Structures are given as C-alpha cells and as structure tokens.
Amino acid sequence: MPLLDSFTVDHTRMAAPAVRVAKTMKTPHGDNITVFDLRFCRPNIEVMPERGIHTLEHLFAGFMRDHLNGDGVEIIDISPMGCRTGFYMSLIGTPDEQRVAESWKAAMSDVLKVTDQRKIPELNEYQCGTYDMHSLKEAQEIAQHIVDHDIGINQNDDLALPKDKLAELHI
C-alpha cells in the first residue's frame, strides 16, 4: 500500500490551530489544486467531540466559501479528518496560508453567530447521514477556541519524518 502524504509528517510536532499545505497538484488542464490541513487540535493530545465536529462540518463548508472563494480560489470540499483533530480543505487555486488562516478565523466567527440549531444547513434525515448527531454548543466551543488563538502555519519541511524513521515505522 502506498504511503499517503499525510503520514509523512511528524504529528508529535504539529502546532494547532495551524494551517499546512498538505499537497499541491495540477490537473491535466493546468488548474492548480491545493489541499490544506486545517489543524484544530494537537494530534494525540486533543480531539474534537463527534457531535461538535459534525455540526461544524455542516456550517464550516458554507462559511469558509463566503470568506475564501474568489480572486482565483474556489473551494472544492472541506471534510473532517477521521482522527477528529482537523479538516482537509481541497480547492482550486493557490492562496497563501495567511489568507486561509484569516478566512478560517472569519468562518469561525460566523459559527458563533448561529443562534439556533434549526439554522444548521442540511440538518434533516434526507440530506444528512446522521442527522440526530449534532451539537451547536460543541461546534461553537470549537469555533471559540479558534477565535481565541492565533492560527499558526505548519511547514512540511519542519514536520517531515526522516527517511530512516519512515522505514522503521513502515509495516
């Protein structure tokens, strides 16, 4: 099985909250695709609660588009990580990490303005696979944590696992 990009960085040294360019690629037509690691929590130390991250997934996707789309950028998808320490965001374009961080913080401020769980988009059995697993309160606690802290930048070169360590860890 090939080693995925996300497993070549040392999770014990990741800062959070922080933005990291996880991957860049070009489509056959020449479009730039960038995948960002939006790390909300320090891996293996903190974790977002499942109801909160699920609600945040519903809110974050729209709010982030409001703040980041335009000027050569269009978000394709924002999805939570299985480890519940962050989200991956795939987009067309190459915005710098600071622009992403500012948009992320603005999106979290928008989450804090939602006043009623019934205002969560697609919160129904037809559009959500687990529509009763939500918590606006938990989502807002996560958002408040981001608003209250500076968003750093994680650099791949600083986090790269050495080749000998990768060989040692490879099964």
Swiss-Prot record:
Fe cation binds at residues 54, 58, 128. InterPro entries: LuxS_sf, Metalloenz_LuxS/M16, S-ribosylhomocysteinase. Its cofactor is Fe cation. Its EC number is 4.4.1.21. One of its GO terms (molecular function) is S-ribosylhomocysteine lyase activity. GO terms for biological process: quorum sensing. Involved in the synthesis of autoinducer 2 (AI-2) which is secreted by bacteria and is used to communicate both the cell density and the metabolic potential of the environment. The regulation of gene expression in response to changes in cell density is called quorum sensing. Catalyzes the transformation of S-ribosylhomocysteine (RHC) to homocysteine (HC) and 4,5-dihydroxy-2,3-pentadione (DPD). Homodimer. This is S-ribosylhomocysteine lyase. It comes from Pectobacterium atrosepticum (strain SCRI 1043 / ATCC BAA-672). The lineage of its organism: Bacteria, Pseudomonadati, Pseudomonadota, Gammaproteobacteria, Enterobacterales. The gene is luxS.
